[in-house]
UniProtKB/Swiss-Prot annotation:
GO process terms (BP): glycine betaine biosynthetic process from choline
InterPro entries in the cross-refs: Ald_DH/histidinol_DH, Ald_DH_C, Ald_DH_CS_CYS, Ald_DH_CS_GLU, Ald_DH_N, Aldehyde_DH_dom, BADH
Subunit structure: Dimer of dimers.
Modified residues (Cysteine sulfenic acid (-SOH)): 286
Protein's UniProt name: Betaine aldehyde dehydrogenase
Positions contributing to NAD(+) binding: 150-152, 176-179, 230-233, 254, 286, 387
UniProt lineage: Bacteria, Pseudomonadati, Pseudomonadota, Gammaproteobacteria, Pseudomonadales
HAMAP family, sorted: BADH
Protein task: Involved in the biosynthesis of the osmoprotectant glycine betaine. Catalyzes the irreversible oxidation of betaine aldehyde to the corresponding acid.
Length: 490
């Protein structure tokens, strides 16, 4: 029997039964427990959600900027009041350690919402003089109804990253969470309603991306799609959005990010950064720095520091506050990661630690994969070329700065990059040559609400967070005013 009641759709300010009896299971990856049965939205449900969103958006957009700002701030307060409850649910649904979800997932999502709530009154146009008797003014107007499609690794945070700027700009959003982790997004919908967001302004449709996601991207009255997920799926989303009605898209996609350790780096700091860039959230972070480049003569020393730190990882029940490394998000994803580890072994990478599923005791019930480090890796290996999205670090060696820049950029991805050095001249010189949208110097992973996030190459289109994201949920209308006489050529 499931732990929670049947999870329904959230449409028009409340829970609503789907148009069919079809459901799917929400599974706790730490032990295989069925958390809930979740309804699958139908195409008719998508239409209901769009109609509801259109109605709610008109009410929402007609409010003053200060009214919208106050309502969003109330939602921030409720999120923070319910932080531990939401974090515990996120841990059950994703397998992420409570020590992480309690301090990161809801907290940073609320920070983003608070940031955009403060920017609502700052949405403004320009006045452009043409001549003494004429001028132009511009208006930033909401797009209307937009869609958000989330990934499974940061469910509530991603829902907030997408909905916060969308709602701040006066839009309504229909959000489809990942089929793997749907539960906390439904709670977010409750919170928006409790805060005073009009019915229909934030609807949640659960179901598969192949069905619900496609129906949203193809819908002619949805003006924009904001998607987070894999690159292959992102290409399909972009094609569908453009072919249906030339929708705008924002996409945060896959990565295979380089972390470069230079010869003057503090190796302890470099090892700490590499650990965070590979094993935080059990390695399920799109920006992870999984290609770790180290000078050849420092390889052995660096490897020793990594092995020492891996031994300190506290793998365990994610609900235990002492645990800092939980299971992967699902058993299917575990098999995918284990497949990549097998390829690493087959292709000649040297295994430093990990490399298998954890099966001792209660671990056997869950989707646990040991923190894994390969070294002596080469650029053509599958584990170096493809995104694994799991706890697998690949160590590569290099000789010169020019070589490592070239090899770091030798990828179809361009989401993130980082380097560790004491030489600030080198730091800026190299970072400016790395083909990535998010870069860190002597750090890794922090993404403040004010910081635009997005990728180069096949890692994405557009940016999330920062002022640019708010602007991208508006469209500019130019209005010319003529105060003088008007002369026709006819």
């Amino acid at each position: 029997m499931a732990r929670f009641d049947l999870q329904k759709l959230y449409i028009d300010g409340g829970y609503s039964d789907a148009g069919s009896d079809a459901t799917f299971e929400a599974i706790n990856p730490a032990n295989g427990e069925v958390l809930a049965q979740v309804q699958r939205a139908t195409k008719e449900d998508v239409e209901r959600a769009v109609v509801s969103a259109e109605k709610g958006q008109k009410i929402w957009a007609a409010m003053t900027a200060m009214e919208r700002s106050r309502i969003l701030r109330r939602a921030v307060d409720i999120l923070r009041e319910r932080n531990d409850e939401l974090a515990a649910l996120e841990t059950l649904d994703t397998g992420k350690a409570f020590s992480e979800t309690q301090y990161v997932d809801v907290v940073t999502g609320a920070d983003v919402l608070e940031y955009y709530a403060g920017l609502v009154p700052a949405i403004e146009g320009e006045q452009i003089p043409l001549r003494d008797t004429s001028f132009v003014y511009t208006r930033r107007e909401p797009l209307g109804v937009v869609a958000g499609i989330g990934a499974w690794n940061y469910p509530i945070q991603i829902a907030l990253w997408k909905s916060a700027p969308a709602l701040a700009a006066g839009n309504a959003m229909i959000f489809k969470p990942s089929e793997v982790t749907s539960l906390t997004t439904l709670k977010l919908a409750e919170i928006y309603t409790e805060a005073g967001v009009p019915a229909g302004v934030f609807n949640v449709l659960t179901g598969s991306g192949r069905e619900v996601g496609t129906w949203l991207t193809e819908h002619p009255r949805i003006e924009k799609v904001s998607f987070t997920g894999g690159t292959d799926t992102g290409k399909k989303v972009m094609a569908s959005a453009s072919s249906s009605s030339l929708k705008e898209v924002t996409m945060e996609l896959g990565g295979k990010s380089p972390l470069i350790v230079f010869e003057d780096a503090d190796l302890d700091r470099a090892a700490d950064i590499a650990m965070m860039a590979n094993f935080y959230s059990s390695g399920q972070v799109c920006t992870n720095g999984t290609r770790v480049f180290v000078p050849k003569h420092l390889q052995a020393a660096f490897e020793a520091k990594i092995v020492e730190r891996v031994a300190r990882i506290r793998v365990g029940d994610p609900q235990d506050e002492n645990t800092n490394f939980g299971p992967l998000v699902s058993f299917a994803h575990m098999e995918s990661v284990l497949g990549y580890i097998a390829k690493g072994k087959e292709q000649g990478a040297r295994l430093l630690c990990g490399g298998d599923r954890l099966t001792d005791g209660d671990f056997a019930k869950g989707a646990y994969v040991a923190p894994t480090v390969f070294t002596d890796c080469t650029d053509e290996m599958t584990i170096v070329r493809e995104e694994i999205f799991g706890p697998v670090m690949s160590i590569l060696t290099y000789e010169t700065e020019e070589e490592v820049i070239r090899r770091a950029n030798d990828t179809d991805f361009g989401l993130a990059a980082g380097l560790v050095t004491k030489d600030l001249n080198r730091a800026h010189r190299v970072i400016h040559q790395l083909e990535a949208g998010i870069c860190w110097i002597n750090a890794w992973g922090e993404s403040d609400a004010k910081m635009p996030v997005g990728g180069y190459k096949q890692s994405g289109v557009g940016r999330e967070n920062g002022i640019s994201s708010l602007n991208n949920f508006t469209r500019i209308k130019s209005v010319q005013v003529e105060l003088g006489d008007y002369a026709s050529v006819f």
